[in-house]
Amino acid sequence: MPRLLGVEIPAKKKVAYSLRYINGIGPTRADLLVKEAGLSPDMRAQDLTEEQLNKILHLITEHKWVLEGDLRREIAGNLKRLQAINCYRGVRHRRGLPVRGQRTSTNARTRKGPRKTVGVSKAAAAAKA
């Protein structure tokens, strides 16, 4: 498995698909890298030579894209900033609720997690009666 930027990219997939395993590189950037490096779109990652890997790495650094750990840190910093200034979006992130205006009376289960059933136990109900 070839390694790029500390990420092992899958060897048996086409280069454009395997580059997407790097955080911050999606379909558009992957296709751009393959085209700029002069590689065949049908080429597999295991067939890349060391020279071609270096060419791809050079193109990535030349574009000055924020990738992998730096991108994760930047996103985490953005969320912390929103939470620190107590803006609406930050509060929604902090509470684990939908941020972009979705309804929460019903739905939003992905963000809120599984239902927490609120009810009375049988012992408490029997004691009241």
From Swiss-Prot:
Gene3D superfamilies: 1.10.8.50, 30s ribosomal protein s13, domain 2. Pfam families: Ribosomal_S13. InterPro entries: Rbsml_uS13_C, Ribosomal_uS13, Ribosomal_uS13-like_H2TH, Ribosomal_uS13_bac-type, Ribosomal_uS13_CS. Keywords: Ribonucleoprotein, Ribosomal protein, RNA-binding, rRNA-binding, tRNA-binding. HAMAP family: Ribosomal_uS13. Part of the 30S ribosomal subunit. Forms a loose heterodimer with protein S19. Forms two bridges to the 50S subunit in the 70S ribosome. GO terms for molecular function: rRNA binding; structural constituent of ribosome; tRNA binding. Belongs to the universal ribosomal protein uS13 family. GO terms for biological process: translation. GO terms for cellular component: cytosol; small ribosomal subunit. It comes from the Bacteria. The lineage of its organism: Bacteria, Pseudomonadati, Verrucomicrobiota, Opitutia, Opitutales. This is Small ribosomal subunit protein uS13. Residues 96-129 are annotated as: Disordered.
